[in-house]
Amino acid sequence: MKKIISMFSLVLIGLGNVQGQGMKKEAMMPDVSSWPEASKMAVKEITDKYGKPDGVTANELIWMNKGVWKKICITKMETKHSFPIEHTDMMQTTIMYKVPEDKMDELGVFDGSVTFDRTQGTMSARCDMEGNNFLALNLAHDIITGKKTVDEARKAYGDIVKEKMNGGNPEYMQKLTFATQENTMDPDKNTTGLTKADVMNGGKGK
């Protein structure tokens, strides 16, 4: 009898663990029901393609190392953006890419939603759909490699979006047309002469 009771207890414990795991898993599922419609659509697009996010807060979802992306971040907050047409930005996708110093200003003129982090060695695009981020980064690469001027890239952006809206399937919106890079981080150089010891001593030296 004791043996039967013990077995029954183990079954109950096992069921409790499974239910507990299920509840924990369900708790990790993001609730975006109160988010703006465009942000919810972005979440659905990325979740359908890459699965559940790796990080969840009340205002943003994060996926790490999915497809070609080092990071994908979708935010509840949307930012108005008028280029190439009126829309809002909320989906940022990031790749490993070393932007040459002499091209940094040109990228800023091309599209304010294409950004880079020289220290981390990344380049990002922030728009409303993955395809638009592919497009922005592909055109940014064209500028960096000298294939297009800033004006040519901005015109191409509009032309390609029109093609897509008219039922086309432009390559620049399907994937990155170039390979992402490695070893792109740039720690910069110490040109101040200061050391950690100097900082700890308030710059007074030893």
Annotated model-derived regions:
Residues V11-V18:
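Hydrophobic h-region of N-terminal signal peptides that target proteins for export
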